[in-house]
Each structure stands twice: as C-alpha cells, then as structure tokens.
Amino acid sequence: MMNASRTLISTCLLAFVLAGGCASFQVGRDVQAGRAALQTGHPEDAIIYLGRAAESDPNYKLPTRAQESILTYLGRAYYETGDNTKARAVLERALANDNNDYLARLYFGLTLYRSNDRERGRKEIDAGLNGMHAWLDEVTSDSVYGIYWDPNRTIRLAIERTLAGKPEAGEFTASAQRIGRQFDSEIDRARQSEIQSTYQPGGKN
C-alpha cells in the first residue's frame, strides 16, 4: 500500500513538472513568434502571441545576454499599432519590474511623445538611448562574448548622432524607433555569431 502511494505521488510530481516544462516551452515559442511578427512589420499578430505568453508568464525574459522582458515586446507591439493607452500601461509594468530595461524606457518615451507629453517623452527617450549605449559599452568590454555585440559600433554611433543632433520631431522619433529595431535585431545576430564561433572548428568548445 505504501509503495502504491509513493508511486502515485511520484507520478503526480512528474506530471506537474512536465506540465510546467510544457507551459514554459509554449511561452518561449509564443515570444519568439511575437518577436518575428514585430520584426516583419505585423504588430497585430505580435499582440496575439505576446499577449497569450504574458498571461501565462508576465515575468518571462529572453534567455539572452540582454534578457529583454516579454512586457517590453508587448508594449512595443501596442505602440506600433497606435494604441498608446495599452502601450503605456504595459511598458510601465515592464519598468516597474526592471527600471534598467532600456528598450522598455525607449518605447515608453516614444509613447509619451506621441501622446503629446513631449517634454517627458523626450527625457525618457534620451534615457533609454543613453542606457542602451552604456549597456553596449559594458557588454562589448567583456573579453569572451563582447566581440559579438555591435562590432562596428553601428548602433552606438546611431545613438550618438540622434542625441547630438536637433532633428525635427518626426525625424527624431523615426530615428529612435529605428535604433530600437536595430537593438532587437542585434540580440539575434550576436547570439547567432556566438553560437557559430563556439561550434566551428577551433571554436571555444
């Protein structure tokens, strides 16, 4: 009887672990699908994937050096569909969870700027861009994996030009959005470069 009880308990625990693992796997798949939709200009589709994933695990972060939040991407998706109210609410949650989420701060600033709160919006955009620049400086200083990030300083130079210039409102926000997209793409490019370097003949493995 005792053995039967132990077997039942073990089976239940295994089922619980597997269910949790399956749920985490699905969240990861939805986040990647949502990011892909954003990167290909389909924010409405991104909201479907990212919204579902955020309901399951609102604290999920990308398993990369940048560790971007699912809420950051969902907020960006709402921003790109023109829904400032939802974008602001979600991005505020992202920043409440991580005040150093510079991509979230960038899109939060863009949302405020487009909502006619331009003074505060500009400050938040500047803070987001400066934070991204500092983060890239820090990560590229690492002797092991720093070489894979922004190797030609393309993103950092774009940030410097945007912050140093005095572009018209439309040009400024367009430049800031472009940098946000570049940073997101850099996450994938850097990871792919690191993987290729690790597993090629003579690599780190």
Regions found by a protein language model. Name each.
Residues 54, 102, 110-137, 163-167:
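TPR/TPR-like (Sel1-like) alpha-helical repeat modules
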Residues 135-205:
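Terminal, low-structured helical/coil segments at or just beyond the last alpha-helical repeat
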